[in-house]
Amino acid sequence: MPIFLNFSAGSILPENELNSLRYIVQQNQNDTVIIRGRHQMEIRYIESVNGFTIHPVHSNHLSILMKRGNSLARNLERQINNGRSFEQVSRDFMLQLSLNIGWQKGAENALKSKIHSHAFIVNPDEFTCSKQYLECPITFCIPENGVFVKNSMDSKVCSLYDKSAIMQLIRKHHPHPLSREKIAKEMIIDKNNCYFDIMNQHFRILDTD
């Protein structure tokens, strides 16, 4: 069903009308057409970039009418996209996406680097606890090359992990096996900052306060 809109090249639509228009277009993607007099415009919502694209539908090829239709489309497109053209919306989306990917890659590299620097050869005889407390929560075996990881971001309790197993989780973007949180470099603990709490029977982070 077409939408009839009283709109000219210099018009500024109230925000409530823009919100209504956005909603209608988002709900009717197939054949939404905006008509004012003899000008018809197709409007589409592109969910992938969260933006609207508007194109005039030219029923004739008179140059002056085509230019006016293009001007109306550009004006309305900027208003419905909060001051940006659809091209700008797409460009901003791609820029933000590349920044996010770069940030995520940097965070992942920092996490891997910290695991490498905090990993150590596990000698069960060096620990005062029973060997069962040295088993990795992923492999259920005592690791040859291990690293201490907090049980959750805010926990003071940590566990010994097999270095290769925890690295595999990170490469596959799997969550922390105990807390189900995203694994972060703040969870990686130096061996010298952990001790076995005999009373509570688990490894604990040394208080530095």
From Swiss-Prot:
Keyword NAD among record annotations: no
One of the Pfam families matching this protein, by short name: T3SS_NleG
UniProt-recorded Gene Ontology molecular function terms: ubiquitin-protein transferase activity
Phenotype of the disrupted gene, per the record: Significant reduction in bacterial colonization in C3H/HeJ mice.
Top-level lineage group: Bacteria
Subcellular location: Secreted; Host cytoplasm
Induction summary: Transcribed for 1.5-5 hours after treatment that induces type 3 secretion system expression.
Disulfide bonds: none
GO biological process terms on file: biological process involved in symbiotic interaction
Main location: secreted
Described function: Effector proteins function to alter host cell physiology and promote bacterial survival in host tissues. This protein is probably an E3 ubiquitin-protein ligase that interferes with the host's ubiquitination pathway and targets host proteins for proteasomal degradation. Mice infected with a strain of bacteria deleted for this gene were colonized less quickly by bacteria.
Protein name, entry field: Probable E3 ubiquitin-protein ligase NleG7
Gene designation: nleG7
